[in-house]
Amino acid sequence: MKKQEKELMLKQIIEFERQTMFKLDVKNDKPYYQGFLMSTSDYLPDNLVIDGELRCFKESKKLPKGLKVKKKLDISETNITEIPYDCEFGSLDMSETKITKLRDNLELDELRTYNSSLQQLPKGLKVKGTLCISNTGITKIPDDCEFSELFSQDSKLTKLRDNLTLNYLNVRNSLLTELPKGLKVNGDLDISYTDIAEIPDDCDFDSLYMCSTRITRLRDNLILSDLWIDNSFLKELPKNLVVFNMLKMTNKSITALPIDCLVNRI
């Protein structure tokens, strides 16, 4: 490291510590912090490495150059409008921000974009866990996008690709009008308040929430953890239905449980 660069780094560290009362180390010629850091991002020194998580305060307006956050970078509800191209992070929460673009080929543990200004997902996005695009203007998910859980309630999402296998899917009150072929959800499937009118016979799920939908039929022999059918168009329960936890219904057309229906509680 050149003398001038080192002097600038030390100057930035001193100013950061004066503003925040947090102490930084120097490791491999870079500012270093281990643990969970909460700060106004404007005070962060360039090339800071955080071996943990960073939560930026609401008044934050920009991120420093060369920031690396090994775990979660939380800039939700801040005034940050862009993420530098050289910024690295394990997970990102950019909810309630004016950010409009993410760089291509991101690989993350989680991505939360709730109520942000993001209009489309980047190319080559890979999310190991939760992808949240709720209450955004995103209308489609690229075919090369990978994720294991999707939160897309109150969104403009209109289509999902075929043969998805997920741990959780919530498209409540979205613009989705049909479920894709070969959909498999290991946990909850929530399609409440959508215009989805039928569930494909090859669709698998552990729990189903279909309140206020136009669905009139469920296939026989379903075994579920929960089933919520409030205000749906369902006129009768399927044969041999098993619900381990709760069957929630206010459908006036269904007045009694069939003899072959097993339910823990209603």
Indicate where each model-derived feature is located.
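Concave beta-strand-loop units of leucine-rich repeat
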Residues: 33-39, 52-60, 71-79, 88-98, ...
